[in-house]
């Protein structure tokens, strides 16, 4: 047991560069890769936490109307059902929320439509 304590003390005194070199030499001597184990360990808890953090509702935000405001106003009207004045105010007041609480697929579709009209869009 005293030998193990001595090894622990010796390893604790290593610099980062020395520890990295030790790992490299042990990998070569034993024919293993130390990189595989930490990746597996890091992937396990992250995979378990991912479903909890996965968003189901997204908000489409008009970041900038771009140079072609008329087309963007038309697209905003089609998406939101707003009147001409309300859609114009929304576009000119960018950044503004266009639609909230939508599914990811719908949010991506709305983003494509608005970007095709010349707007800069964010999905949050």
From Swiss-Prot:
Q: Which Pfam families match?
A: Ribosomal_L12, Ribosomal_L12_N
Sorted alphabetically, the Gene Ontology cellular component annotations on this record are: cytoplasm; ribonucleoprotein complex; ribosome
User: What keywords does the record list, in alphabetical order?
Assistant: Ribonucleoprotein, Ribosomal protein
Alphabetically, the GO molecular function entries are: mRNA binding; structural constituent of ribosome
Q: Does the keyword Ribonucleoprotein apply?
A: yes
* Cysteine pairings via disulfide bonds: none
Biological process (GO) annotations held by this record are:
translation
| Record function comment | Forms part of the ribosomal stalk which helps the ribosome interact with GTP-bound translation factors. Is thus essential for accurate translation.
Q: Which HAMAP family match?
A: Ribosomal_bL12
Q: Which family does it belong to?
A: Belongs to the bacterial ribosomal protein bL12 family.
Report quaternary structure and partners.
Answer: Homodimer. Part of the ribosomal stalk of the 50S ribosomal subunit. Forms a multimeric L10(L12)X complex, where L10 forms an elongated spine to which 2 to 4 L12 dimers bind in a sequential fashion. Binds GTP-bound translation factors.
- This chain's protein is named Large ribosomal subunit protein bL12
What species was this sequence derived from?
A: Anaeromyxobacter dehalogenans (strain 2CP-C)
Name of the gene: rplL
């Amino acid at each position: 047991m005293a030998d193990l304590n001595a090894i622990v003390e010796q390893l604790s005194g290593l610099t980062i560069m020395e520890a990295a070199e030790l790992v490299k030499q042990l990998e070569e001597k034993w024919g293993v890769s130390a990189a595989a184990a930490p990746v597996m360990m890091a992937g396990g808890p992250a995979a378990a936490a991912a479903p909890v953090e996965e968003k189901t509702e997204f908000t489409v935000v008009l970041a900038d109307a771009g140079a072609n405001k008329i087309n963007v106003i038309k697209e905003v009207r089609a998406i939101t059902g707003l009147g001409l004045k309300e859609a114009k105010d929304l576009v000119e007041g960018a950044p503004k929320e266009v639609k909230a609480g939508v599914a990811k697929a719908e949010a991506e579709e709305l983003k494509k439509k608005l970007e095709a009209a010349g707007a800069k869009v964010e999905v949050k």
